[in-house]
Amino acid sequence: QPGCYRDVKDTTCTAQFRVVRDERSERFFEGVEGELYFLAWTTTPWTLPSNTALAVGPAIDYVRVKCRNPYTDEAQTVILARELVPSYFTKKMEGTFEVEDRVYKGPEFEGVRYEQLLPWVRPMGDAFRVIVGDYVTTTDGTGIVHIAPTFGADDNRVAKQAGIAPLFVIDRAGKEQPMVDRTGKFFRIEELDPAFVERYVDAGKYGEYAGRYVKNAYDDTLAPDAPTLDVDIAVALKGAGMAFKIEKHVHSYPHCWRTDKPV
């Protein structure tokens, strides 16, 4: 339908995904200061709990940057596309970071594993490794795409090709469901299969967000100025030292032509 996409101003987040140090990733740790992270940007932080992969571009050049986390001041090293370094490390910041000379092509990272960003629910299958995606660009973001197979056609396609499991929950009827139900909220714990919850869900961490709507427009009980789920997730990541940049960003977002609400 015409007019279904509209420009909206939302909270965006560049998240830090901690690289697992093992035989596959060891060479990327040479000379690293602090922890090593992949940086990935999203305009929909509410999808981050459903992340199961990161995608790099097949022909994109990547570099490591020694820096400090902007919110915690912890020394760290981050990986992002060389072309996008100026978007995150400006001339005003000179002296606080070091871009390394060594350049890596995207496929060199294929198979490298990272820690789950928000371990609320564990996936039922192989996840949390870097894959190559043919649609990854350096138009914006970091040149590394956060993959949530349950919330994007491209994400689902490349994840399937790479054998990456989507993050499903199992409801009381025994059906696999995305973490967000048809009304636009995270499933409540009591709506999920108890055996699944016991085995795969961290009730303490997930319980804080269970039942929350991903868009405030769907919750009539909220005040107009109530913080959004996107904001709360970004703030939680910031406090945990897992966010690199949080900002407002204007982007095109689909809206229902009947209700005029975001989908």
Where does each model-flagged region fall?
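Non-cofactor substrate-recognition interfaces
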Residues: 28-39, 45-263
